[in-house]
Amino acid sequence: MMSTYVTFKHFAWAGNLVRSVFMSRNVGRYQSSKTENSQDGNPLLKYLTMKIKATGPITVAEYMREVLNTNPLKGYYMHHDMLGEHGDFVTSPEISQIFGELIGIWCVSEWISGGKSKSLNLVELGPGRGSLMSDILRVFNQFRYLLNTCDISIHLVEVSPKLSEIQALNLTENSTEAKYEDKSPCYKMGITKTGLPINWYYNIQDVPSGYTFYIAHEFFDALPIHKVQKIQDEWREILIDVDQEIPQKIKICSWF
């Protein structure tokens, strides 16, 4: 058995998990990583502890989904704006508009070389604050004399209520929440500042089919992963379990 002890910081964000796994020290048969005392009363830690005790150890992928995306208590991306000067990190669209404008030019070029389809879905996965899409749409607006024969619609796949709110403020003059009785696959809709329809979805499967460009900037590096480790010529999946000796911590253990 190999184990690594992990604690939760304020948002329990998966960078701590990655550092714990990949920057650990070998100590005989065990691996350990430097940790801090966990915060008392952390609701996400309590939730995960109860869940693991009830159903057994969880995969690294499930752990990442909880601490990053889906947990309504303290999911990292769910409740706060982590991007920009006052956030936790900065992405290239927040620094310069050039990156997004070049992608916009590429989209127009590919649309032309593809035969100038009568319709185009522009889909972005994990749009952040909406800065990249804003820069792309600025280019589309500049080339409107070329694109005026194309029915363009914007589709954003975003699970975070906070980030979708910021995206709507940056990209639209006004947006509305979809009503349950509408039975629409999107949960929010609006019109961009350049006059294009825009919709928000929780799942990529809900995005309409058709001639589509998919954009995913710094999206895949935050997707949940399954971690496996080869031990004595056997592959074992790394799971997250409760530490029986230190209740305020959880541990990473290899599984047969």
Regions flagged by a language model, labelled:
Residues 1-39:
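N-terminal mitochondrial targeting presequence
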Residues 4-10, 37, 47-50, 56, ...:
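Class I S-adenosyl-L-methionine
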Residues 6-12, 20, 50, 178, ...:
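Hydrophobic transmembrane signal anchors and adjacent membrane-proximal interface regions, especially
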Residues 29-35, 65-71, 133-134:
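Short, functional N-terminal and low-complexity linear motifs
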Residues 36, 55, 87, 91, ...:
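Conserved aromatic-histidine-acidic binding/catalytic patches
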Residues 39, 43, 47-118:
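Conserved Class I S-adenosyl-L-methionine-dependent methyltransferase catalytic core
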Residues 96-192, 201-202:
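SAM cofactor-binding core of SAM-dependent methyltransferases
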